[in-house]
Every structure is written in C-alpha cells, then in structure tokens.
Regions:
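A detector for small-residue-rich transmembrane helices and their helix-helix packing motifs
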Residues: 1-136
Length: 136
C-alpha cells in the first residue's frame, strides 16, 4: 500500500509542480517512496540513517543532473512514501489511548491513514489535472 500511495503522490506532484500539461505514472516515484519508507523505519529503530540518506541523496543528484528525469515525481514519491510509513508506525500511538492499543486497533488506524493519504494523492492529481486542462 505504501508503494501505491507513493506512486500516486509522485504523479500528483508532477501534475502540481511541473510546467505545462505533463502526466506521469512511472514507478520511479514509488521507488523513491519506498526509500522514504526505509528512512522512517530506520529512524524509528534508532539506527544510524547515514546509509539510507546517502542513497537518497545520490539518487536525487541523478534526478537533478540527468535530462528527462522528473524531480517532482521523485520528491513527491519520497514525501508520500515517508508520510505513509510514518502514519503506519506513529499514528496508532498518537490516536489510540494506552488501554485500546491492541494490534488490531493499531492496524485499523494505520490502514485508515494509508487510505486517507491515497485519497489525498489522487485528489491532488485530479485537481491539478483538471486545472491544467482548463476544467476548473
């Protein structure tokens, strides 16, 4: 599910921030989302994030320096993937009281958060696409 949230988040970022009538549905934004997810998990585990951050920075440098690569899709995927993973990991502890923090309740909160992020990503893409084509 994190993959799909990042995929749609990257596509929405392209539609919001790229000039012109650009569409994107490449998997690279989703892959960046998985890198963001790994970063969140590493930070939660209190392990040194140096390796993950290095990989992300190297890939972002490639995104900036190589022609025809959508930086907006990559950054959008990274942000939405990290946000989706943070929602799964941190939100249940924030929303649920200590007595109701069962695995089942935490799972429900995480899934609802993922669905909300997915709807936001798709909604942003639809709004951006509609305004780019003159429908809004």
């Amino acid at each position: 599910m994190v993959y799909f949230v990042a995929l749609f988040g990257g596509s929405a970022a392209v539609m919001l921030f790229e000039a012109g009538n650009v569409r994107s549905a490449g998997a690279s934004g989703a892959i960046y989302g998985l890198m963001g997810a790994v970063l969140v998990v590493v930070l939660k585990a209190r392990v040194s994030p140096t390796g993950v951050i290095t990989i992300i920075v190297i890939n972002l440098v490639f995104s900036v320096t190589m022609p025809g690569i959508s930086l907006a899709a990559h950054v959008g995927g990274l942000v939405f993937g990290a946000a989706a993973t943070a929602a799964i990991i941190y939100l249940p502890g924030v929303v649920l009281h200590r007595e109701s923090r069962t695995q089942q309740n935490a799972s429900r909160v995480g899934w609802v958060a993922l669905v909300v992020l997915l709807v936001i990503a798709i909604g942003l893409g639809v709004v951006a696409g509609s305004s780019a084509s003159g429908l809004v």
